[in-house]
A protein has these predicted regions:
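Enzymes that bind and transform nitrogen-containing heteroaromatic metabolites
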Residues: 1-168
Length: 168
């Protein structure tokens, strides 16, 4: 089974503030949907709750939500107690790929288990960010493909580039 991280990060590895994204990038969201559709997705409870209610659970995907709260339940998701538990659930499913979609502690716990990442590098810094992608994430990776370069336009406040990278 392929375990893949998909994340958008700022220049200083910023990924969020106050349980929300720091940007609205429709073409990045479109890429996210295209890549994850039909696969399993692993996320922490806060990431799940940050998804607008009308979009959750994410349609046409196995939603695996990690929470240490045994009483936390959501319709349409499979609950996991830990990142390793979430991986076991994904491995025992019929899905051939699992995407790790956040948040920071989930990325941190699973970054050594992945073989590929789709990283959206947002061409901006966000001093008010309070959530960050793991430090040194770029160690032991090779850029395989530059997938998309988006310039600033009426729908995109920030330029960004999406890369496919592989772990060595």
């Amino acid at each position: 089974m392929g375990v893949i991280i998909i994340a958008a990060i700022g220049r200083k590895s910023e990924i969020g503030k106050g349980n929300d994204l720091l940007w609205k990038l429709p073409n990045d969201m479109k890429f996210f949907k295209e890549k994850t559709l039909g696969h399993a997705v692993i996320m922490g409870r806060k990431t799940y709750e940050s998804i607008p209610k009308k979009y959750r659970p994410l349609k046409d995907r196995l939603n695996i939500v990690i929470s240490s709260n045994n009483k936390y339940e959501e319709e349409g998701v499979v609950m996991a107690k830990s990142p390793s538990d979430a991986l076991k659930i994904a491995e025992n499913s019929d899905y051939d790929q699992v995407f790790v979609i956040g948040g920071a502690s989930i990325y941190e716990n699973l970054i050594d288990k992945i073989n590929k990442m789709y990283i959206t590098e947002v061409a901006a810094s966000f001093d008010d960010a309070d959530v960050f992608f793991p430090e040194n994430w770029y160690k032991d990776i090779v850029v395989k493909n530059k997938i998309l370069r988006q310039e600033v336009d009426e729908k995109h406040e920030y330029a960004f580039t999406i890369f496919e990278v592989e772990k060595q």
